[in-house]
């Protein structure tokens, strides 16, 4: 038995300089697991609640000492002595202790830190890499990365309304080569922007944040960067968008302030369809407001056979909401953010439900990250096939890519890179 003998919660800082929660779990054998939780900027209204202190004079109210206290007191008391290898039972214990639908009492940040740290301790105790502990002998597929090389919206201070413009390397035989492709396109884009006298400062997720005149201009420039790096757009590298449409939906209209447009759901569907016809876009995330299910249905009926339509704010990694979406034919993919739901067990259930329905599951970081690379192990362990973890800069993003390189090396000849086949929802 891998008995838990000590739990320590602490307040640390994330990549934006805001407090977040870290937890150490110590087992009877002396083995320790450590985990830190991320935090989002554009958040869905139905996400599990991250507990903040609200004390204006300290970290502008964003402190997490209350969440840390919960870990060090009642959570510690509830799980002390439990077997760390019994993840489902441990997470169930946390859920019952919290007693709310949205984890607002203990805080999803406190609960997730403990859930992750326990899993890492148990993996270490078992002598297994974390991805192998999660997935067993079937874990051998590396994920296709969606690399955010231009930031807009809530992730940057510029005129772009769409939040993320991503490249997706798909023709490469290995993850290592896919990562090299992404890095080379990233540096080619930097040179293009610099030559034009445009800003090469980066946003929260490590992508560039220049002031383009339109989304069209941004996408055209990315195509130039792909070509400049020696790759073929539409063959070697595809494009992906995260609209984060809930952020610019006001008074029943999609208000693209950067382009001076106010569009209905049908008009915004047309707008996105035009972009998908003009550019090799394989994936669009949050193409409609999280509550605009009629708009989502329009978008899915229009583009769902040729473009991956990912629900982030729409589904918030919640099986109850995902089940409703599947039944209504809304979207064809779910974004998986571990802190949207708050425990590993619930996260894995959402991935499994998506796969059973023929939806893809894209494992994702948050805009406020740490050096914790657990999501890389989840992506491989659960054979998710896709990961979204930022650009090719900032160590909080690179840490996940580097962990995937290590995993691929560890897997050796049995490692596989799915490329275009990761988008099985479009077959």
Curated annotation (Swiss-Prot):
Entries under PROSITE patterns matching the protein: ENOLASE
GO cellular component, one term: extracellular region
EC nos: 4.2.1.11
CDD domains recorded: enolase
Pfam families the record matches: Enolase_C, Enolase_N
Location of the protein in the cell: Cytoplasm; Secreted; Cell surface
Binding site for Mg(2+): 242, 285, 312
Alphabetized GO MF terms: magnesium ion binding; phosphopyruvate hydratase activity
Reaction catalyzed: (2R)-2-phosphoglycerate = phosphoenolpyruvate + H2O
InterPro entries membership: Enolase, Enolase-like_C_sf, Enolase-like_N, Enolase_C, Enolase_CS, Enolase_N
Major enzyme class: lyase
Active-site positions on this chain: 205 (proton donor), 337 (proton acceptor)
Coarse class of the protein's main subcellular location: cytoplasm
Cofactor: Mg(2+)
Cofactor annotation comment: Binds a second Mg(2+) ion via substrate during catalysis.
The keyword Transferase appears for this protein: no
Alphabetical list of Gene3D superfamilies matching this protein: Enolase-like C-terminal domain, Enolase-like, N-terminal domain
Keywords on record: Cytoplasm, Glycolysis, Lyase, Magnesium, Metal-binding, Secreted
Keyword Cytoplasm: yes
An annotated GO BP: glycolytic process
Function: Catalyzes the reversible conversion of 2-phosphoglycerate (2-PG) into phosphoenolpyruvate (PEP). It is essential for the degradation of carbohydrates via glycolysis.
Similarity comment: family membership: Belongs to the enolase family.
PANTHER family named in the record: ENOLASE
Protein's name according to its UniProt entry: Enolase
């Amino acid at each position: 038995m891998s008995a838990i003998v000590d739990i320590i919660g602490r307040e640390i800082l994330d990549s934006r300089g805001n407090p977040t929660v870290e937890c150490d779990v110590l087992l009877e054998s002396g083995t320790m697991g450590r985990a830190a939780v991320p935090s989002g900027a554009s958040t869905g209204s139905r996400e599990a609640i991250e507990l903040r202190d609200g004390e204006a004079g300290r970290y502008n109210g964003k402190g997490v000492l209350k969440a840390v206290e919960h870990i060090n007191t009642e959570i510690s008391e509830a799980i002390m002595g439990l077997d760390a290898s019994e993840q489902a039972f441990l997470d169930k214990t946390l859920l019952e202790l919290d007693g709310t639908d949205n984890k607002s009492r203990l805080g999803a940040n406190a609960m997730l830190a403990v859930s992750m740290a326990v899993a890492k301790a148990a993996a270490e105790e078992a002598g297994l890499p974390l991805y192998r502990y999660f997935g067993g002998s079937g874990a051998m597929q590396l994920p296709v990365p969606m690399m955010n090389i231009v930031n807009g919206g809530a992730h940057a201070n510029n005129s772009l309304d769409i939040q993320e413009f991503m490249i997706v390397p798909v023709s490469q035989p290995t993850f290592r080569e896919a990562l090299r492709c992404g890095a080379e396109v990233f540096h080619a884009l930097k040179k293009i922007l610099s030559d034009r006298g445009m800003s090469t400062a980066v946003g929260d997720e490590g992508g560039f944040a220049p002031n383009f005149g339109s989304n069209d201009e941004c996408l055209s420039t990315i195509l130039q960067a792909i070509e400049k790096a020696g790759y073929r757009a539409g063959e070697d590298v595809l494009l992906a968008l995260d609209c984060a449409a809930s952020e610019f939906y006001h008074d029943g209209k999609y208000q693209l302030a950067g382009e001076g447009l106010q569009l209905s759901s049908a008009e915004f569907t047309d707008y996105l369809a035009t972009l998908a016809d003009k550019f090799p876009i394989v994936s669009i995330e949050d193409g409609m407001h999280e509550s605009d299910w009629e708009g989502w249905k329009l978008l899915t009926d229009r583009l769902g056979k040729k473009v991956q339509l990912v629900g982030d704010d729409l589904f918030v990694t919640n099986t109850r909401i995902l089940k409703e979406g599947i039944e209504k034919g809304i979207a064809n993919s779910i974004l998986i953010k571990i802190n949207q739901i708050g425990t590993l067990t619930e996260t894995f259930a959402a991935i499994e439900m998506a796969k059973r329905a023929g939806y893809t599951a894209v494992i994702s970081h948050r805009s406020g990250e740490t050096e914790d690379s657990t999501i890389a192990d989840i992506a491989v362990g659960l054979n998710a096939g896709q990961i979204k973890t930022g650009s090719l800069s900032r160590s909080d993003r690179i840490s996940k890519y580097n962990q995937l390189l290590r995993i691929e090396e560890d897997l050796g000849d049995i490692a596989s890179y799915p490329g275009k086949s990761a988008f099985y929802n479009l077959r």
